[in-house]
């Protein structure tokens, strides 16, 4: 009896979650937690060009923090923001608390852009924001003519031959570019060239 009630409760909860995510019109419909655990409505970023990234501190792509901070310093005056969400799902490369992660990033890379609480971006516990982001822009593949892209493709295909048919986030430092009206414009894999990303940011920042 108790178990049946629990199952019904969980079913209703999941249904509510699905409806909320599917009914979202833009990223402004979502709330996240900042690095102090406070709720932050993404509606606070209306009118900004946003880059949303899932990060890690012990990844081969971690040096991208330097390039991201450079972009932030260059375009922040034009209404550009980076929203960083540490995630420990890929090789457990984002260990520690959000406070420890923040200290590492500010100390080593002088990161000034907002960093939010750690989240999951794939699976049963993924944050609704990422469910929405992936629904808007799925995975379009790695550039296998690029050495890093080829490596990622081979590594992930060994784990799952059909990995490229799923919209899941593939690795740390996947990025989503969001327009000033909250719509997801483009997805960048961690191996994509930062100069291409900057060109898109520059165009939106005019």
What are these regions (language model features)?
Residues 10-21:
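Bacterial N-terminal signal peptides
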Residues 48-49, 57-58, 62-86, 105-109:
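Conserved helix-turn-beta segment immediately C-terminal to the redox Cys motif
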Residues 22-43:
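N-terminal "domain-start" segment that seeds a small globular fold
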């Amino acid at each position: 009896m108790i178990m049946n009630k629990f199952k019904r409760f969980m079913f209703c909860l999941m249904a509510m979650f699905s409806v909320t995510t599917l009914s979202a019109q833009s990223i402004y419909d979502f709330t996240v937690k900042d690095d102090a655990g406070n709720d932050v409505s993404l509606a606070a970023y209306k009118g900004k060009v946003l880059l949303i990234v899932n990060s890690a501190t012990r990844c081969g792509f971690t040096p991208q923090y330097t390039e991201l901070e450079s972009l932030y310093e260059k375009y922040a005056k034009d209404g550009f923001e980076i929203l960083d969400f540490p995630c420990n799902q890929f090789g457990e490369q984002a260990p520690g608390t959000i406070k420890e992660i923040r200290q590492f990033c500010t100390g080593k890379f002088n990161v000034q852009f907002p960093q939010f609480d750690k989240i999951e971006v794939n699976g049963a516990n993924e944050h609704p924001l990422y469910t929405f982001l992936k629904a808007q822009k799925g995975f379009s593949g790695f550039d296998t003519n690029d050495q890093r892209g080829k490596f990622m493709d081979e590594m992930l295909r060994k784990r799952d031959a059909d990995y490229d048919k799923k919209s899941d986030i593939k690795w740390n430092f996947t990025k989503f570019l969001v327009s000033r009206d909250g719509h997801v414009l483009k997805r960048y894999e961690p191996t994509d060239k930062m100069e291409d990303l900057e060109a898109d940011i520059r165009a939106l920042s005019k």
